[in-house]
Amino acid sequence: MLQLCSTFRPQLLLPCQFRFTNGVLIPQINYVASNSVVNIRPMIRCQRASGGRGGANRSKPAKPQVKEGSNKTVIEGLVTESLPNGMFRVDLENGDNILGYICGKIRKNFIRILPGDKVKVEMSVYDSTKGRIIFRMSSRD
């Protein structure tokens, strides 16, 4: 019987077989103690069309925090006030008080930022009143 589905390649399923996710044919062996009979059944494993389980390619080098040629600087600061929609008041090391918003990776990974936390803020040279919070340094001391 031929089975087609959107995320897996077509495969041939024989009776009494199980499906796994990586395209290898493995014999399944059953031992019966009373008759000393060994049954060997081939098992077909299917493979995803994408070829992997997803996620990051671990062989690639890590990205630098700030790309070369960009007009951004990274400054450390202290969160003083929490505002709605992932916005914060941040006091920078140089004495400025800016509006900081959290970056997408912090939002995606549900990293909590509270008043009193030290953060790294990425700022553009064009607007010195706003910055993107790219890293939460450590727990509150």
From Swiss-Prot:
Gene Ontology CC terms, in alphabetical order: chloroplast; cytosol
GO MF, one example: mRNA binding
Sorted UniProt keywords: Chloroplast, Initiation factor, Plastid, Protein biosynthesis, Transit peptide
Location (main, coarse): plastid
Gene3D superfamilies referenced in this protein's UniProt entry, alphabetically: Nucleic acid-binding proteins
UniProt subcellular location: Plastid, Chloroplast
Subunit structure: Component of the 30S ribosomal translation pre-initiation complex which assembles on the 30S ribosome in the order IF-2 and IF-3, IF-1 and N-formylmethionyl-tRNA(fMet); mRNA recruitment can occur at any time during PIC assembly.
Protein name per Swiss-Prot or TrEMBL: Translation initiation factor IF-1, chloroplastic
Lineage of producing organism: Eukaryota, Viridiplantae, Streptophyta, Embryophyta, Tracheophyta
